[in-house]
């Protein structure tokens, strides 16, 4: 009964957000929204706790560890591999007598609602039409990967990707201080977000570039870490941390993640993958820095979506859950450009297959290589769209 009430409250929150945006004014829209919300949260209720994997077990063990360590006082220890903001929530949930994992799953579902709202905000920056904005919100809530990574595996990747999506919507609106704050929170929740931050330069080419916003990024990050410092956490452990390349090449990587690393058992190609992503991101930002190209907000969102897909494909720190955030950005883009539907389908297939392999293992007969090929196909579609739209702009001029 508790799960039903909480999920019903989150569904009500989703409806209130749509109502506040003025997207449910007609009876037809209300009927469609209620049906989609019933399907989205009904599936979450049915699949809640089904086939927990190693990620869910790790979260449950971490919450139990905090319960034994005295709640928030356990933050001073570096025994757990989770980021500090995530440990804040684990320490908070450990104060409950039981059901800490269930509370963490509710947090994941709340972040998915936030991502749906951020997706419709990105669409709103291009068009005020209600239909594409409504589609963006509802499709994000109905994505299979979002349901799997939230209520099944309790993966926290939706937490930091929610801030990336919010940062994108703020950047498209020119709200640089809020954008910097959202990026800081994303980096605090997962250091992998630091690789996405430079790509946001594609939003600044035709607007006043406020370097002062970087101070906001640092300030927000420090503010998030202050409670951990006050509780006795060493300052060196509050910085974004990555394993060394030597450590990466000495152990297997996430074999359940789509990308180049699913094609090799060991991470001997880790330096190559990192170099490919860095070069690609620099070329993308350099190309989009031209005012004639960067004035198109659709292309800005395309560039960010493409960079997010490349991050999952080439960076060795990404896992099967990381593709969900890029998938959400693609949904927002597809609602603006329906011709990009094949890219969304490929990315959704890759994300769902990777998550199913992560949850059910060998019970899923398709190899993870199919997810890697689908991810590559989505990247190719986005590249072709960038080239095609460039030619269209030239012909129109």
Residue ranges and their predicted role:
Residues 49-62, 77-89:
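Extracytoplasmic catalytic/substrate-binding loops of multi-pass membrane glycan-assembly enzymes
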Residues 13, 173, 195-219:
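Perimembrane helix-loop-helix junctions
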């Amino acid at each position: 009964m508790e799960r039903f009430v909480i999920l019903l409250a989150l569904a009500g929150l989703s409806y209130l957000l749509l109502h506040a945006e003025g997207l449910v004014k007609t009876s037809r829209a209300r009927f469609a929204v209620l049906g989609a919300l019933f399907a989205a949260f009904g599936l979450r209720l049915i699949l809640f706790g089904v086939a927990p994997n190693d990620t869910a077990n790790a979260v449950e063990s971490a919450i139990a560890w905090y319960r034994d360590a005295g709640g928030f006082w356990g933050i001073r220890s570096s025994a757990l591999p989770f980021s500090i903001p995530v440990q804040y929530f684990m320490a908070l949930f450990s104060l409950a007598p039981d059901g800490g994992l269930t509370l963490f799953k509710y947090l994941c579902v709340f972040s998915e609602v936030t991502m749906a709202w951020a997706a419709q905000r990105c669409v709103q920056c291009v068009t005020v039409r209600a239909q594409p904005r409504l589609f963006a919100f509802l499709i994000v809530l109905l994505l299979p990967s979002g349901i799997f990574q939230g209520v099944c595996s309790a993966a926290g990747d939706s937490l930091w990707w929610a801030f990336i999506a919010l940062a994108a919507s703020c950047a498209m609106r020119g709200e640089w201080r809020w954008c910097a704050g959202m990026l800081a929170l994303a980096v605090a929740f997962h250091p992998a977000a630091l690789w996405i931050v430079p790509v946001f330069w594609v939003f600044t080419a035709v607007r006043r570039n406020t370097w002062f916003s970087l101070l906001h990024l640092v300030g927000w990050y420090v503010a998030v870490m202050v409670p951990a410092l006050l509780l006795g956490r060493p300052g060196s452990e509050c910085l974004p941390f990555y394993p060394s390349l030597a450590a990466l090449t000495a152990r297997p990587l996430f074999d359940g993640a789509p990308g180049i690393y699913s094609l090799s058992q060991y991470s001997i190609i880790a330096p190559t993958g990192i170099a490919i992503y860095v070069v690609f991101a620099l070329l993308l930002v350099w190309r989009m820095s031209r005012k004639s190209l960067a004035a198109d907000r659709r292309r800005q969102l395309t560039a960010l979506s493409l960079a997010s897909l490349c991050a999952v494909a080439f960076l060795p720190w990404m896992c099967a859950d990381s593709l969900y955030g890029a998938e959400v950005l693609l949904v927002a883009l597809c609602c603006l450009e329906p011709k990009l539907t094949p890219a969304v389908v490929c990315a959704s297939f890759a994300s769902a297959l990777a998550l199913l392999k992560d949850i059910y293992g060998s019970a899923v007969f398709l190899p993870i290589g199919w997810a890697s090929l689908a991810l590559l196909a989505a990247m190719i579609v986005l590249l072709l769209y960038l080239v095609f739209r460039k030619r269209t702009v030239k012909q129109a001029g």
